[in-house]
Design a protein with these regions (language model features):
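Long, structured ligand/cofactor-binding scaffold of large enzymes
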Residues: 1-56
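Long insertion/accessory domains within large nucleic-acid-processing enzymes
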Residues: 71-88, 93-96, 100-101
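C-terminal interaction appendages of subunits in large macromolecular complexes
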Residues: 45, 49, 91-94, 98-370
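Conserved alpha/beta core surface patches that mediate binding of polyanionic ligands
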Residues: 2-14, 70-82, 155-160, 196, ...
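Short coil/turn connectors at secondary-structure junctions
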Residues: 16, 59-60, 83, 90-91, ...
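Short beta-strand elements
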Residues: 12-17, 51, 84-87, 161-169
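P-loop NTPase nucleotide-binding/switch module
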Residues: 30-33, 54-81
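A short alpha-helix capping/helix-loop junction motif
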Residues: 21-28, 62-64, 249-250
């Protein structure tokens, strides 16, 4: 059940992430509501195309693998994501004595910032703030920009981001429609607070508050008394309800098995080091694969120089198990090469096949040299 609950937050339907990892069908609740999600038997999921970037290179030894909890299979110690996902998806958690609250940022801005840090590792947090303007949350809402707070987050990993709900005034119906709320706040919390203010007589301008969430998205409606100024009502609500709230950033991460608090700039630099390591390992993996292939083809090339001799050796061998040793002895090739050659069908030894293999040998030599 815990795994399913975790997956719910990763789905497109839950709307917690700017870029969901899981494409979903069914009811997965909403991050801005306490509405329960459906049981697993009523939902369908599959990895989103976005995940191709999360797992890129995982089959090329880009990261280390270890045994899972019961040693029945191997699992990666970390995923070789091709972009700084830790800054694109919000992260929240508590370990022993360590709390973590990492805000999400716009993917395009993070990519621009990463490229800038790659070109200039000495880039300052202020220069970075020109490219990465501020955190960006899936719930929407306006960021109340404060340069000092933003620079603190970028430099130290600590600070707060103030968010304010977005709304429109429907003059015809004389009501306020709240369309976006701060990240981490639920519609139930807001309604409960507004209802309490109405009961205590502190919000006489509002006659009713309704949850109008539907398939089209989030909507919280406030009916107003005639002659009420909607701007003044919202100013009061921003002050007394979660329609305006803050997100406290605390960027604690694990680097080389050690807990560290990093700012955005340091995170990008650490991710660049990690990604360069992944890319280097992928190149080594591909080079080794090409070297193995070249080794087999070099053995095949030796056979192709005297194909009649190879056929004679096979034909004159009495037992199947002696074919490999006899080819090894006859052409001075190793067992791996002999096994590879023995598996090739006779029909493949035509002129076209031979020319293609010779070209492939030359191509592999060039690629490995590069």
């Amino acid at each position: 059940m815990a795994i399913y609950e975790t997956m719910v937050r990763l789905t497109r339907g839950n709307e917690t992430l700017l870029h969901p990892f899981v494409d979903s069908k069914g009811s997965f609740g909403k991050q801005y509501s306490t509405m329960a999600f459906a049981a697993s038997r009523y939902t369908e999921v599959k990895l989103d195309k976005f995940c191709a970037e999360i797992f890129s290179g995982i089959d090329k030894n880009a990261v280390d693998f270890v045994d899972n909890y019961d040693s029945t299979m191997r699992e990666p110690t970390i995923l070789p994501t091709t972009f700084p996902n830790i800054l694109v998806s919000p992260n929240s958690g508590v370990a022993v004595g360590i709390a973590c609250e990492i805000a999400s940022f716009n993917l395009a801005e993070i990519c621009d910032g990463t490229i800038a840090a790659l070109r200039n590792p000495e880039i300052t947090s202020e220069e970075l703030s020109e490219l990465i303007k501020a955190p960006d949350f899936a719930s929407g809402a306006s960021i109340l920009y404060n340069k000092e707070d933003i620079l603190s987050i970028y430099e130290t990993g600590r600070g707060s981001v103030n968010m304010r709900s977005r709304y429109v005034y429907d003059k015809e119906s004389n009501c306020i429609d709240v369309l976006e709320i701060p990240f981490g706040v639920t519609i139930e919390q807001i309604i409960a607070k507004i209802t309490d203010l109405i009961k205590r007589g502190e919000l006489k301008e509002v006659t009713d508050v309704r949850d109008e969430i539907d398939l089209h998205g989030f909507k919280l409606t406030l009916d107003l008394r005639r002659g009420t100024d909607p701007e003044k009502v919202m100013a009061k609500l921003f002050k007394k309800t979660p329609l305006e709230s803050s997100y406290a950033c605390n960027f604690n991460v694990i680097v080389d098995n050690e807990a560290r608090q990093l700012g955005v700039r340091e995170m990008l630099l650490e991710w660049i080091k990690f990604r360069m390591s992944c890319y280097r390992r992928e190149l080594i993996f591909e080079r080794d694969k090409k070297s193995e292939k070249l080794h087999l083809l070099v053995g095949l090339g030796t056979i192709l120089l005297d194909l009649d001799k190879a056929i004679k050796i096979v034909r004159e061998t009495a037992r199947d198990k002696d074919v490999i040793p006899n080819l090894m002895a006859g052409f001075k090739i190793d067992e791996i090469q002999a096994e590879y050659i023995a598996e090739i069908k006779l029909r493949n030894f035509n002129r076209e096949y031979i020319i293609e293999r010779i070209k492939e040998i030359e191509s592999l030599k060039k690629e490995i040299a590069e």
